[in-house]
Amino acid sequence: PSALAAGLTGRTPKYGLHLDENRLPTKRFCVKYQPKDLTDWGILGAIIGKNLGSYWEVPLIEALEVIPNSDEMKHMGAAMASYGSTPLFHLHKITPEAKNLKIEQFNNLDLIDINSSDFESLKSSFGSKGDKIDVVVFAAPQLSIVEMQKVANLSKDKSFKVPVIVCTSPQVYADSIRMGFIEKIENSGAKVLQGTCFYQQYAREIGEANGWKKLLSNSTKIVNILGGYGYTPALATMENCILSAVKGEIV
């Protein structure tokens, strides 16, 4: 309702994160294990979100050795919001409001270290090598054109034993048709959907109708959500999701 009202009036409430004082960091996180792929970035977001668990908490994330690209930041932010209802984060010396932040002014905040063991603990709670799978889903967040290209290249000359569902936006879908990505993906037996996301389209009913229980994805956000829709979700990198779809089990 508030978003609709803002669209109609051109105004938003002077409230929450629209106020500068509410955008300041409330907790610090020191990243001591550097994410290596999209799944790792999602796991990082999940770890931070679980430690926050509140709309009003704003994390300041420190010690990243690389600047994440848009897809990496997308997966991190999506997982952070899924696990912690966290709408805003700062990456020290990277994101606009944190480029000139002086760490010293936040020395009074709790500082939480994030280690490789934290990554492994979360990852191991979602499936194990050799587990049979019923469906592979790439969604939540919807795939960018870069991700579509990667799925297309990984799917080339493959034949999937289980259904593979890929969700993207209408614009990226149109671009992917023009660039030949959709053809490559669907030639392997996968299905590309546009303008939707898997968990928003009666995911429970789809699973029950098809007998799907074990779902594999590279999205830390979606495996968190779909546990509440009757699935037993598992997590793997995009590459291993594709290989698992070929084999019918987690590789």
Q: What is the predicted role of each segment?
A:
Residues 1-251:
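Non-transmembrane, aqueous-exposed alpha-helical and coiled segments at domain scale
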